[in-house]
Amino acid sequence: VLLRLAPDAISRLGAALGDGVTIVSATNGKTTTAGMIAAVLAAEGRRPVHNRAGSNMTWGVATALLEQHGSEGLFEVDEAWLPKVAAELDPALIVLGNLFRDQLDRYGEIEVLADQWANLVEARAGRTRFVLNADDPLIADLGRDTSQHRREGVLYFGIDDPSQALPELQHAFDAKHCRRCGHPYSYERAFVGHLGHYSCANCGAARPSPDVAATRIELHGMDGTEATVRLPGGEIRLSLPLPGLYNVYNALAALAAGLELGVAPERAAAALGDVRAAFGRVETIDVGGTPVAILLIKNPAGANEVLRTLRMEAGGDGLDVWIALNDRIADGRDVSWIWDADFELLAADVRRVLCAGTRAPEMALRLKYAGWPTERIEVEPDIGRSLDQAVAAAPGRLFALPTYTALLELRKLLSSRGLAKEFWE
């Protein structure tokens, strides 16, 4: 309603943020990364206006500006809405985490978004500083000019630990060709999807050396992660209470943003050591005495990282899993992405799985072809009934893997039972 009555509301309200605006965007991890940056700023006593509820299109940004007061802004922004929001808020810093194939029926291929982002970076060069993922060729390339020199005001982050490389490239490999010349990239190693160490044999474009890099990473499954992080001024140790390499990337982005925002690395690392997961981003909630670990899945790359994390938890009689696959507009109507996610990773490690959501039968079929024992696969489309059945049957922890709108349904359900807040904080 606000934007219909006052289309310039974001720019007008944003003008009050005299201490600057930071924008975070990515296909995967923007909510978590923005939350991490908020925690880093809070360690300095700074409380930015922040759309922490996860509503990341123009109306979510406008609502945060209308309801909160402060002199500094921190906003996660949907990938497609980034150019418009950036034009209205004139950010001092933009953090770009990754681009993965996601909601093809809404956005088209990721190269379209990469082109839009390239135009944004070109237009804002010299006015905005950028924190970019060196390991994503689509993102890293934004930080170079036409002569392949690093643009002024660019800080790169990435992973420099070969021990964490995948044994082979995944199906979810979205950036195969050089944006400069179209030649296929050569990968020395890949960490998450197409994130890794790459180069183009034709034109010489290659992964830039990151300014903020994780050099020694120890993954402890759901118990969290430890890493040594190399910074321009030395090394620090990071203990993160969140699992997976994807959260290492999120933390590196937050540390790099902290540097740009004037927060001492040691203080930023300490803040990240106490960070809480956003709802559905590796949060555990007690449901009827059963711990339910909720891990959002919405595209092949993100799902693969969740599956890698769960494989570290496997043992004994196997894992109890609840997967809710929806095909509503916010999920994307096209659910063919499930065939590119490596569900085969857990085929030998599952005790029981219950498929829910509007496309539950398709999910069950995908698991069958992934080699999950059919006698362990059940289908109940209703979110509430299926969750209750899965909880009742689980002897221990239940792993809940919902897509985006299924996560919203789950959040509403748990909130109605007094088990979770309706909006994450």
Give the positions of each predicted feature.
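Buried hydrophobic packing segments
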Residues: 37, 41, 61-65, 251-261, ...
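Short glycine-/acidic-enriched loop or helix-start segments at secondary-structure transitions
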Residues: 34, 60, 84-85, 105-106, ...
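Short loop/turn motifs at secondary-structure junctions
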Residues: 69, 90, 126, 150, ...
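Acidic, Mg2+-coordinating active-site environments of NTP-dependent enzymes
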Residues: 19, 100-290
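Phosphate-binding loop of NTP-binding sites
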Residues: 2-158, 162-176
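General small-molecule cofactor/ligand-binding pocket signal
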Residues: 49, 155, 239, 293, ...
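Short, surface-exposed acidic/glycine-rich loop or hinge patches that mediate macromolecular interfaces
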Residues: 27, 55-56, 232, 243-245, ...
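ATP-dependent carboxylate-amine ligase
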Residues: 175, 182, 192-207, 256-264, ...
